Every structure is written in structure tokens, then in C-alpha cells.
Amino acid sequence: MSKKVVILGSGPNRIGQGIEFDYACVHAVFSLQEEGYYAVMVNCNPETVSTDYDTADKLYFEPIVFEHVMDIIEREKPEGVILQFGGQTPLKLALPLQKNGVKILGTKPESIDKAEDRELFRELIIELGLKQPPSGTARTKEEALKIAKEIGFPVLVRPSYVLGGRAMRIVYDEEELKEYLEEAVSVSHERPVLIDKFLDNSIELDVDAVSDGKDVLIGAVMEHIEEAGVHSGDSATSIPPYSLSKEIVEEVKEQTRKLAVALEVKGLINVQYAVQNNEVYVLEVNPRASRTVPFVSKSIGYPLAKIATKVAIGKSLREILPEVFERLEKGEAHFASDFLPKEKKIFSVKEVVFPWKRFPEVDPILGPEMKSTGEVMGIDKEFGLAYYKAQLSAGYRLPEKGNLFISVADRDKPKILELAKEFEKLGFGIYATSGTYKFLKEHGVNAKRVLKVSEGRPNVVDMIINGEIHLVINTPSGKREKSDAYYIRRACVQFNVPYYTTMRAGYAVLEAIKSIKKLKEEGKGLSVHSLQEIYNI
């Protein structure tokens, strides 16, 4: 009988934990079978591929809770258990399983604990000489207000006991913080609230890497197209980064290597960073598969979950991927990924899919709480075209002419100017409500004023309904009431008008429209290639 290994899946799908983890579990099963192991899958979701009867050698359809998992282990007597592919759910079982004599394959439970525990992790960051945004933990309302004042607004607040960014909020002033503490969470000694300095106007990055404890291979450095503060699962992302310098990307890769070695990671690691004024800050480290693993694997042509599984059962990266190390040692690696050759000039853009149409009352706005339920991908040699393809796949057909409606929060007004002028050059009519209109007019943009919903009719929502507005850029003001902005966004969803709620997404749209217009002027259309062709381009 072959050696047995148990893989724990991610349990039921929910917003924040979806099918991406199932992808990693299935690849882990295939990898074990390639190495001659008997793969035992434990999961409880009928919607997944890992629970197909012919995927693993044996399937247990059981909840991912300690008692059930322990019963299976006692019955199967495996060599060990792999936890790192099921997201956060199985990770919580690491210490209880180890205490009961179960061998955890891959990253040790102590290392998982060090990455998950805020105090231990802060000590590690200081020890490695890295930077982290200032933060604090509050157990009373008074303590929360005191910490927020010391750190300085805006702050990111969240309960310490939730996953998937639920109940997280960016708070811009004391009044808003009081409201959040009264309405959204109950702060107490048992349920503390975590408060972090929110790095306004920063760029967020995600890194997926594989480590064997000595060597670390960077799968990809991904740049979020939305600003920091939008949940990583809701942001469009680009491989390689499209607006960061090579030096920053190399620094991020180096910091990821340090963290993976210090945490003695054996398998996958995901690190999230924010870059503000050319300074790199570590936001969080997950010593497990992240939801970007399928996207990265398809972008680089290497199955990260398969590689990580081979590492978890004791193989070294140099054994598994000699050709990648050869390329690295010759200095021939792509700047944002150790796996890709230097000449690989391809952009992959991931865009997310939202269920807004199924929930007519939900405000379709992005924030630290995850709301997306799927994702698509666009690949091309230019960032603009890759982004255009991703929008098309997500169901947004970007207009090449027509009218653009702009309404932004005061803090975004200086950034809107260049964007409005560029759209004007492309032949778009610019419409705006009073505040934004006044600002644009004063700075030489030929904008037209349109009424807010509260100012009477015909207003901006009427224009959207009548098909007179073809694109909307509307950033939130920080307040959550059902404002004019809410009705604008809902009308866009209802009438299929592409709308964007962050400035960086607005600039990415501009880049996409410029690229597609240029392509058409040259008499060409979008090129379509299979992934197999792309790896050989």
C-alpha cells in the first residue's frame, strides 16, 4: 500500500473563501499521486472538483472541524496532513492536530501561529528590520478612540474574530469611529477591535511564493489596480506591476524571501504589501495558499500548488525546478517573477466579478469587506489591452466615445484633473455634479453640469437610464448613507454602464481605451491565444 497523505479542503464556499482554494487542493492531489502517494481528500462542499469521486484516491465528505478530522486520521493512519491549500479554515486546526500527535506536512504550526498572532508577528518584523503601519488593539470604546488619535486618522478598524474582511471599515474621523463601534461591533475583552493606520494614497501589492525553508521562488509580484483599502479579493491585479519601479519590485521580492526563511515556510506563502512614497510596508503574511494562486499559476505557466505539495512531502525546490534556478543564477529571470525568462513581455490582468444584480439593494462600492464571487483574466503584450480584455470578460464593454460622468470626493479632486483632460482629448463629453463641475471648470476642462438626484430632474440618474452617460467614475465620500452616489451606482448596474469607484481604476480604464483605439487605428483587432500558445510566445 502506498504512503497515505490527508489533504484538508476549504469547506463551504462563501464570499471571501471560494473555489480558488479548491483549485489548489486538486493540484495537491495530482501532485501526491505523481509522487506515488495515496491521496485522501477531506471536504464538505458538493460544488467543488476536490469532492468529485474520481479526483482523490479516497474522499471523506465531512466538515472541516477537529472532531471529524481526528476520526478520519485515526481510521486512515496517514503519514501526515496537508493544511495549507484550504484557506483559513483548516489552518486553524494546525495546533490542535499537532497536540494530538498528528504530523503536519509543510509549514510548522508554530510558524503559522507566528504569522497569525499580531504581537509575535510585530516582533518578527522588527527583528528583520522591515516596516509595518502603526497599529493597536482596543478592548474598550475609550481605548479605541485613544489608539486612533495616537495613530492618526484615517484608520482601518476590524473585529479580531472575522475572516474575509467582514465588518472591516476605513474610518476618517472620530465621529465615524464612534458610530462604527456602536453599530457594527461589540468591543470587549473577549472580542477586541484591531486598529491599523490606513495608508492613504498607497499602492497595494500581493506576492505569491514557494519556499522549501532554504530557497524561495517568487511566483509573481502583483500590483493592485484599486488603491490600498479595497479588499485584495475585490481588486483587479496586474502581473507584472504596471506602475512601480524595478527597484521597488526587487525590494518587495527580497522582503518576501526574508519573511519566508524567517518563518521556515515549507510550501506556499502569500505576503501583502503597501507602497507609499517609495516606502514598502508589510501588511500581512499568510503561510498558505492564497486566492491568487490559480491566477499566478496561469500567468506564469507553473502550477504553484503542485510544486508546494512536493516541497511539503520533503523535496527541495532545486530538485523540482533545476531549470528555474539555472535561469536565476545567470540573472535571466523576469523582474516580477523568478519563474519567467527575462524576455517574457506579457501582462496578465485579473478582474473580479460581482453579484450586484442578484442583490438590488446592496451599494456596489468597494472597500475592505470582500464582496466579489468570481474572477476573470485578460492577457496581452500591453497593460491597456490586457485590462480591456479583462473588463470585457467581466461583462463591461468599455466605450471608445460618448459621455463620461465624474463625481469624486474632495480628497480625489486634484487627481481627477489629468484624467478628465485625457478623456476630453479622446473625444469624450465630460459631465459632473456641482462640486466636481466647479473644480474642473476652474482648471480649464470643458465640463457640463448635471443635477444631483436631490436637486430635481432631469438628473444624472435620468441620463444613465436614457443612455446618455456611457462611463462613470464615482469615488465615495466616506459616509455610508443612501446618498446620490448610491443611486448613481445602482442605475449603472441596472443599465450595464461601466462604473469605477477608485481613481486608479479610472486611470487603468483610460489606458485601456487609449490602447484599443490605437489598435483599431492601425487596422488591427484584439488577438486571442490559448495559454499553451502564450507560454511559447
Swiss-Prot record:
Enzyme Commission number(s): 6.3.4.16, 6.3.5.5
Cofactor: Mg(2+); Mn(2+)
Free-text remark on how the cofactor is bound: Binds 2 Mg(2+) or Mn(2+) ions per subunit.
Region Carbamoyl phosphate synthetic domain, annotated ranges: 1-395
Allosteric domain: region residues: 396-537
Signal peptide stretch: none
Superkingdom assignment: Bacteria
Name of the protein described by the UniProt record: Carbamoyl phosphate synthase large chain, C-terminal section
